[in-house]
Amino acid sequence: MKATWKPAWHTEKRQPQFAGTDRPPTGHTPFGKKKYLMANVPALDLLNLEQNEGADVSHDLRLLFAASRDLGNVVKTLAGIPTASTGGCEVMINDRDFDIVARNAILLLMALYFEADSAPLTMLHLWYSALIPAQILRAIQENIRPLIQDVCAKIAAKRAGSFQAKKWTYGTRSLRLVLKKEEWNRLLSYFEIPDGLSMTQVHAIRTATTLAAERRDYLDRWLYILPPARRVGAMKFRVEGILLPFGSCRRDFDTTPNPTFFQSKDSWPMVDAADPLDGWSMAEILRKAPLARNDTYRGLFLLVQDTLQRFCQRIENLQVKFQLFHDDALALPNMIEDGQHSFDRIKLSNMADRGWVGPEAALITLAPLLKRASDNPHAILLTLFLNAVHEVFYDTDNIASLHEEMSRLRSYVNLAPDVVLAGDKFNADFIMFTDARPVVRDFDKLFDRWMREHRFGDIGKAVGLKMGSEHTIVPPWPMRLRQNATQREFDRLRASGHVESERYVEWKSVE
């Protein structure tokens, strides 16, 4: 796409499809099935040992990913354990979405079963690519599927609805998977392409969501904020759904859909904007491909492959026990043996958001699982709030902050005087300018308001937790534009799939 490209609604001088719609607080209007098979916030190292227990920690650590989504946080955390650390690690992973649990189970079995030098690339494509090489499908069908088939055969006579557990051990590593009987049988379908699903249908099913005609203006709106050189790569992924560097040969990806995505012959399981870029730090992505900064999918490919390589190599020499559950996070205290005050880290994803279970229910239920400060002063329960500040941003705030935000925004976005004078609210440059207001917004006051409304102080006291004054896992606002940011930093953040208002809170025991 040329640098002079404009969205279709702009050149056709018409009202865009998104005009007049009731947009959600974050400004992202979703379209398609709402499965979160790929993360929508960057993966983080939940241990960050050098800033906490120390790089040479010798005691065992216990981690709980209560609403895990994909494996990004698990992989990044274990890949980051220093070689000087001699302690073991027990990792419990749960999600209430069976599609997520099934994919995570298969990926972990691949990491344990296959050699560390061959597993990363196969894991990468099963994780992110809509189409995969036929040899990857054969590899999991011939090596991983029999592991599940063996369990299904052994539990055939068990009562429907009963929980059944299986533990696989490979050297110092193990994986224990707990599912209901019928879920074990269902897991086998993730190794099979639906009968009669042709490649023509595969393309049509996916692009009916990712390139939907009724979303043309939404797509153009997103493309317009990208640097011109990035738009071609972005569209290539929208069309193909294959995670590869831009110029890489795709011949091996012509015949085989990824069965962990295509469980149905009727629809694509995710929203149109679902993108693997959202699950990793853009700064790290760009550092991976410094000579091809506009090929962000190349940078992502190299980053994920490298992280998976380090993950697979690290767990080869680590006493690590994985446990996978498929349940509501609020039921975990009843599922986990010896759970009371036993975890060094607990990650709740954004389940404490008001739109999910809320902060009170989340903390009352899961705070008792966190180690006391007397046992580990670095033990942390991590909550993420994606929507909090938008829920308390009222019309009066929108008016009151207008002048300050516009003034700061003009430092980064040049809106031509003739665009302003024309008064055309559907001008693409005017829309891009006004859409960027949240990037420069002061969210601290809004989050303070949200915490007061939800009685954070009272909840913390009730469950024996306090908010950490200094974060040692992740900054409170990791995606927010810093003061005196450069133009490059602004452009990078604006072009990301994040809403800039992601707020983390680190909780510690008061005892």
Regions found by a protein language model. Give the residues of each.
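Domain-level detector for long C-terminal conserved domains
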Residues: 1-511
